[in-house]
Regions:
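Short, well-ordered alpha-helical microsegments
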Residues: 75-79, 169-174, 273
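Residues that line or immediately flank small-molecule/substrate-binding pockets and catalytic motifs
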Residues: 33, 68-71, 129-132, 166, ...
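N-terminal binding-site loop/beta-alpha segment at the start of enzyme catalytic domains
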Residues: 6-92, 149, 155
Length: 389
């Protein structure tokens, strides 16, 4: 895209390698363990996950990312089963996070941290991030001395590098990094749709990280899969390039920026793994023709009122009505993209046992948890108007 392309080419020389501030990382692509292969009984398919881990490490990658709340704790234990119990400790990098909904005061943090080590089957974390930082929960972390406790754990050798993951405006990020210059790395949402988005502020947050000389980890490079399920006319533009999956352009876009040391992808099956590894094993930045194509894709997507939900499910964890909000938003997006029959079919399937959009009581708990700052209550009213007939 015109703005993005100028920004990238000023900072990334074709053929150069990424900075790799942290030498433990073998490549600039990581396995996000928020969305794993699942069995029908709701458990992680550790047989399939183990195969994916083997393929990932076998291709020369070694970075894994999890959090205590991912899959209700099953992500951590699946990593113990499929990764840490099967490989020597120096074969992988493991990142975990301190999530605000799992502690209230300083005394809660060390026991929680120890439980995370045990769940993952390790003695230390390579990276430990203050999770989903924003203006509101940063006050909770400060009052509980979360950063100070993490720095103490680092001195004890239980954390190698301290970082944050972030979901808020650039000025808040600037404030946090100014308050705690000991933070070594920042994880931000970054993709070609959110680059100039005023809600997510990918570009502005990127600029703040560069201002503070902080290496960057990227989450949501395909925006929860929405940059894989493109409208037909947008997809045709990428198809015209003559090769590469839709995910490949999104992930390579993020990885092409100077200072971005790691791009995460949540891979739920071996097909995703195979595709991602194929173009990140020997990474090359996007060329001018590819940037121009992405610019056209952005214009098409922005011309349509799609709901920018990433399916993180933070909202559903808070919803007292058990409304499957991300799935209902996906149905609405399908309808907008003219997949009318499938949208109605899936809506009825997802709500067969309750949780229809019209059951929202407008408590607002979902909106306070949403990293995308979506007006979920209003959006559910629109969903209800479309499907609850």
């Amino acid at each position: 895209m015109v703005v993005q392309m100028q920004f990238v080419t000023q900072k990334y020389t074709k053929g150069c390698k990424y900075m790799n501030t942290f030498k433990e990382a073998k490549k600039n692509f990581g396995f996000g363990c928020m969305r794993l292969p699942m069995l029908e009984n709701g458990e992680v398919d550790t047989v399939e996950f183990s195969k994916m881990v083997d393929a990932f490490i076998g291709a020369g990658f070694n970075y894994f990312d999890t959090a205590h709340g991912y899959l209700n704790g099953k992500s951590e234990t699946a990593l113990r089963t499929s990764l840490t119990s099967r490989y020597p400790r120096d074969a992988y990098i493991l990142t975990n996070k301190l999530s605000g909904n799992h502690f209230e005061k300083e005394e809660d943090i060390r026991p929680l941290f120890q439980s995370q080590l045990e769940a993952c089957g390790v003695d230390y974390f390579d990276f430990y991030l203050m999770h989903a930082q924003n203006k509101k929960n940063f006050e909770q972390y400060k009052s509980a001395r979360a950063y100070e406790t993490a720095l103490e754990l680092k001195k004890e050798g239980k954390i190698r590098h301290l970082g944050i993951s972030f979901h808020d405006s650039a000025d808040v990020l600037d404030m946090i990094l100014s308050s705690y210059p000991q933070v070594e790395i920042v994880q931000i949402q970054f993709n070609y749709i959110d680059y100039e988005d005023e809600g997510v502020q990918s570009r502005k947050c990127y600029d703040v990280c560069r201002k503070h000389n902080k290496p960057i980890i990227v989450m949501e490079p395909v925006k929860g899969g929405s940059l894989v399920s493109l409208p037909e006319d947008a997809g045709a533009i990428l198809d015209s390039l003559g090769g590469g999956s839709y995910a490949s352009y999104a992930i390579r876009y993020a990885a092409s920026f100077d200072g971005i040391e790691m791009v995460l992808s949540g891979m739920g099956n071996m097909d995703m793994m195979t595709d991602n590894v194929s173009y990140m094993k020997d990474f090359t930045p996007l060329d001018e023709k590819e940037y121009e194509a992405i610019d056209k894709v952005v214009k098409i997507i922005r011309s349509r009122p799609l709901i920018s939900c990433t399916d993180c499910k933070y909202c559903t964890e808070r919803c007292p009505q058990n409304i499957p909000i991300p799935q209902l938003f996906a149905c609405m997006n399908d309808h907008t993209k003219l997949n009318l029959w499938r949208a109605n079919y899936l809506y009825n399937k997802y709500t067969a046992e309750g949780g229809r959009a019209n059951e929202c009581i407008e408590c607002g708990a979902c909106e306070s948890a949403c990293p995308q700052k979506l007006p979920i209550r209003d959006l559910l009213k629109a969903v209800s108007a479309q499907f609850d007939k």
